[in-house]
Amino acid sequence: DEVEILIVNDGSTKDNTGEIADEYEKRYPGICRAIHQENGGHGEAVNSGLRNATGVFFKVVDSDDWVNEDAYREVLKTLRKFCHDNVTLDMLITNFVYEKQGAKRKKVMNYRTAIPKEELIDWSGVKMFMLGQYILMHSVIYRTEMLRECGLELPKHTFYVDNIFVYQPLPHVKTMYYLDVNFYRYFIGREDQSVNETV
């Protein structure tokens, strides 16, 4: 009952997304909520999620990605503590893992050299990022109200809106916390993915 899952069906016609979303809403009332809309692309799906979110924090998980169950428990425990202690946290950062189809090794994006672990900090506590080390949508959980206050609105029918989602709110972030867990699993390898070079 501490988690709200919004499943946005962005006008999907090629699969059973709508039916699956409705089934989850029936099976987990009060936790899962199905949102059906005309196709607006990835950005509009995120916008719908943000418009409908009632939770303190907001995390986007794309339909072909997933989160690690053990890390998920750690994330919830951390967020719960900030809420319980009545401490404002604008951004929680976690590691993410590239789950590349056919790859023998998994690349983990972590922030150990740039951000102190398990410490509430502001920007003065952040060190220089290394080349190839960057914050992506996969690594952030934002405070919902902060996203609304900064006027975040992603463009419709546009690829690569992830960067706007991550970087537009950053000047509004006053507090952050790095939890060193491999939370988000970013799947790469589907033929029709926008990140596929042939698409």
Predicted regions and their residues:
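Nucleotide-sugar donor-binding/catalytic module of glycosyltransferases
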Residues: D1-V199
